[in-house]
Amino acid sequence: MTLARYVYTPDPQEGTLLTPVNNSTAIRWFIDNLPINRVGMDEFTRGLEIGMAHGYWLIGPFALLGPLRNTELGLVAGLVSTIGLLLISTIGLSGYASLVEDVPTEFDRKGWSRLAGGFLVGGVGGAIFAFAILQFFPLVSAIARIP
């Protein structure tokens, strides 16, 4: 899957979306190496990697900016909220896979289902990993300061 297929067309009536930012070699390399665009990956592995990243970074805003941020349960509430959002996102991915008629040729319905399953497993795993890091950070920090 190449970026140019989506942003460039030779027909001047349709226009071109190529800019120095999205057409540079570094940006193309970055976009081509994102898990959704990487060639040769299994759908479950692709979803697992995407889910881990989302679960890992979603817990922070929920835990630190949520309504329970100043309580003892702020981090747990952030974890539960993150898992809830990941479940909603997985339901959305599964709904897309089963309801849309024109699925891209890279994924069939089974591939989208496997991607959604990997997204959920990876997302929950990433959220639990981030929760553990945030929960035990004071302990690790105290151990590191011991002379």
Swiss-Prot record:
It is a multi-pass membrane protein. One of its GO terms (cellular component) is plasma membrane. It is found in: Cell inner membrane. It comes from the Bacteria. The keyword Cell inner membrane applies. The keyword Secreted does not apply. Gene3D superfamilies: Photosystem I PsaL, reaction centre subunit XI. One of its GO terms (biological process) is photosynthesis. Its main location: membrane. Pfam families: PsaL. SUPFAM superfamilies: Photosystem I reaction center subunit XI, PsaL (SSF81568). The chain crosses the membrane at residues 73-95, 115-137. The G.violaceus PSI reaction center is composed of one copy each of PsaA,B,C,D,E,F,L,M and Z, and forms trimeric complexes. Belongs to the PsaL family. HAMAP family: PSI_PsaL. This is Photosystem I reaction center subunit XI. It comes from Gloeobacter violaceus (strain ATCC 29082 / PCC 7421). The lineage of its organism: Bacteria, Bacillati, Cyanobacteriota, Cyanophyceae, Gloeobacterales.
